[in-house]
Amino acid sequence: MKRLLSLLTGVLVMTGLLMALIFPQSAYANVSDDKLGDRGEKVDLNNSSVRAFRQFPGMFPTIAGKIVVGGPYASVSDASSVLDASQKSVFDKYKDNFTVTDQEIAVNEGFDRINDGQYR
């Protein structure tokens, strides 16, 4: 009986290893990876975290926080509606670096867009 269980366990392990080789890793990709790949080099106003705005001087954290909390947006120019006059001028300076795609729940769940847990 012990040999039979050992044999069955070995067969199951080998089957699992073979299945991992047969199915490509792209089959395991999740929605978040697809969404983040869609936007290219631009920052997606509907799906990016506040941290993504650090590359634009003057936007992190105040303007970025307002944009993240104020979404979703239909177009890039809609994001300026949550900003005051001085913040709009900073936003307009970097406007070409932003894009808008449909919101994805996997990226926007909870407070992950405010604090995505990336620390130095």
UniProtKB/Swiss-Prot annotation:
Instruction: State the InterPro entries in the record.
Output: PSII_PsbU
Q: What Pfam family is a match, any one?
A: PsbU
This protein's membrane topology, according to the annotation, is:
Peripheral membrane protein
Keyword terms, alphabetized: Electron transport, Membrane, Photosynthesis, Photosystem II, Signal, Thylakoid, Transport
Keyword Nucleus part of the UniProt annotation:
no
Tell me which GO cellular component terms the UniProt record holds: extrinsic component of membrane; photosystem II oxygen evolving complex; plasma membrane-derived thylakoid membrane
Q: Does the keyword Membrane apply?
A: yes
Localization terms from the record? Cellular thylakoid membrane
Signal sequence interval, chain numbering: 1-29
Gene Ontology biological process? photosynthesis; photosystem II stabilization
Main localization is: membrane
Instruction: State the oligomer form and interacting partners.
Output: PSII is composed of 1 copy each of membrane proteins PsbA, PsbB, PsbC, PsbD, PsbE, PsbF, PsbH, PsbI, PsbJ, PsbK, PsbL, PsbM, PsbT, PsbX, PsbY, Psb30/Ycf12, peripheral proteins PsbO, CyanoQ (PsbQ), PsbU, PsbV and a large number of cofactors. It forms dimeric complexes.
Query: Which HAMAP family does this entry report, sorted A to Z?
Result: PSII_PsbU
Family, similarity comment: Belongs to the PsbU family.
- Please give the NCBIfam families that the UniProt record associates with this protein: PRK02515.1
Function summary: One of the extrinsic, lumenal subunits of photosystem II (PSII). PSII is a light-driven water plastoquinone oxidoreductase, using light energy to abstract electrons from H(2)O, generating a proton gradient subsequently used for ATP formation. The extrinsic proteins stabilize the structure of photosystem II oxygen-evolving complex (OEC), the ion environment of oxygen evolution and protect the OEC against heat-induced inactivation.
Q: What is this protein called in UniProt?
A: Photosystem II extrinsic protein U
Species classification: Bacteria, Bacillati, Cyanobacteriota, Cyanophyceae, Synechococcales
| Gene name in the database record | psbU
